[in-house]
């Protein structure tokens, strides 16, 4: 199933998601295409959030912003509908996670603005092409994600700590992994830390704040990349009336080819 899904087109995956036939994490799916995180908030907060993303481009690289009231990401995936095409969503009310759903159409408002934020799943195929293993794909689980003590630059009501994703990499390949991913700044780029998780406030790799723990083997080093789940941690601090996000690991498959995001 994994290999079959990796060969699908973005539209094929989105159709499965839209029909409710695929509700799990999207790592490895439509492998040549960029995946996106989601934040939906009301128009009166959209400028401050866009400013937050501009000031924090490492964790929050913006791939597309919808027109107010429109669920169509006209640049990233013109045939998509952000209300139905993510496998799972989270509803936050006053900073508290209250619901997890597979369709946000009932929650959609005429002044809602959707932000698509780059996802590190998008550079995983480039790592695989360099024979660098991706443990969460191999183990069939969600990527582990952790809150750090790295401060984001505030904007309006939005402030908080960066969230990172972690992939165990053989020590001899860690520098190569950094080189490969540095080509993709639109989907988080180079790592923010190689090894020493305590230095960024992570005390236990076996207890991720989001996603699932993975095996770190002898001779491997944990490598951390800025993560598009950062807005969810920030939203918990800002406590707006309602914000909708993707569920961590459950992304939109866009029509943007991964290689088109590479800078070298």
UniProtKB/Swiss-Prot annotation:
Gene3D superfamilies named in the record: PSTPO5379-like, PSTPO5379-like domain
Annotated keywords: Lyase
Enzyme class: lyase
Pfam families: D-Glu_cyclase (PF07286)
Claim: Hydrolase is one of the keywords in the record: no
SUPFAM superfamilies per the UniProt record, alphabetical: PSTPO5379-like
InterPro entries, per database record: D-Glu_cyclase, Putative_hydro-lyase, UPF0317
GO molecular function terms attached to this record: lyase activity
EC number: 4.2.1.-
Domain of life of the source: Bacteria
PANTHER family linked: D-GLUTAMATE CYCLASE, MITOCHONDRIAL (PTHR32022:SF10)
Family per similarity comment: Belongs to the D-glutamate cyclase family.
Protein name: Putative hydro-lyase RBAM_004300
Organism taxonomic ancestry: Bacteria, Bacillati, Bacillota, Bacilli, Bacillales
